[in-house]
Amino acid sequence: MAKPSKEQSIALSQLKDEVLEQMKTIGIEDESRLNSLNPIPLAVLRRNATQRHGVTRFRRGANASELKTEDVQTVDLHPMLLDPSWHDYARFVLYHEYLHALGNRFHDAAFRRLEQLWPHDGAERGREFTQFLRQRTATWLWVCATCDKKYPRKRRANGRFRCRACSTTLVDVMNTQEAN
């Protein structure tokens, strides 16, 4: 968890208001349970995280079989989600984390049903966001000379790997995209 900047705190607060209002509209929980989400602190993940888009952190010693909103220490979102181009996906990620904060610990069928109640398109952008993060932080691109597929990576391939699509040996190319 990283402490958000002033701008990030403002963006997180606006995001929280939007998501809580939408959760009231779709009737996820009763109003008092939703209001219990309001005091949960929002923070940001480290900028170099590539796999995790958000996380709900529970306090140590919380009873895992009976999680309550009071047991939530913080909800962290990836700082790049606060960029306006990812706003729709950021709302979905915060909604997802709030479902955890309401006591839905596992990604089981019941959790997925609640997740599907989200009325906006952002939910489909998860894979795209992961690829964006990997591309941003990659030092090397493993490039297929045959089909031009690119695999962003931290290390060189040195001819040890083949393309998933056509089995051609991958070539190392320095990633020229700027990391923010």
Predicted feature locations:
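Active-site-proximal or metal-binding-adjacent scaffold patches in catalytic folds
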Residues: 1-92, 101-180
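Walker B catalytic acidic pair
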Residues: 97
